[in-house]
Amino acid sequence: FAPKITVGKAGSGLHIHMMLEKDDKNYIADDVGLTNIAKKLIAGVLGHAQSLTAFGNTIPTSYLRLVPHQEAPTMVCWGDSNRSVLVRVPLGWIAKTNMIKDANPQERGSVPYIPGKQTVELRSPDGSADLYHLMAGIILAAKDGILAEDALEKANKIKNAGIKCSQSIFLNCLLSEIVVLT
């Protein structure tokens, strides 16, 4: 479970998928796409990226994984099909896009769509994570975003508009004051 063992190849992450559910209904996406409450959750998670990274990446080799072109997050923003973002929303799994079939091209039969399974993915943690603090932090960050009045505006502002960091300064960029959503 080492985060990175080979230079030039993707490391091993511990991506955390989150779902908002109440009364057996998933509130991450609806028939149109991502919901406003999901965007607020994302804003909360990104607003607390510093703390979540500290809990999710606890050893020096954790940061060797977080470099460009290694299928790891290198931008503090969110998006749907971009693996370089800190928070990814795999919206392609909703019924109208047929991402399931694209991801499984060898599948001969029809791939059933299972509604209500949409998630939001935090991509930075790895096997070194302090899981108890990380999960508590994610819950509190999500709650903070959902309750914040300006979270929707912040989420819309930072979709695919992250701060791009070189591999040598990703940690500094992530932990700097620039990243804090203001």
Residue map of PLM features:
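Active-site capping/gating regions of soluble enzymes
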Residues: 1-150, 156
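Acidic, glycine-enriched catalytic cores built around paired aspartates
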Residues: 152, 156-182
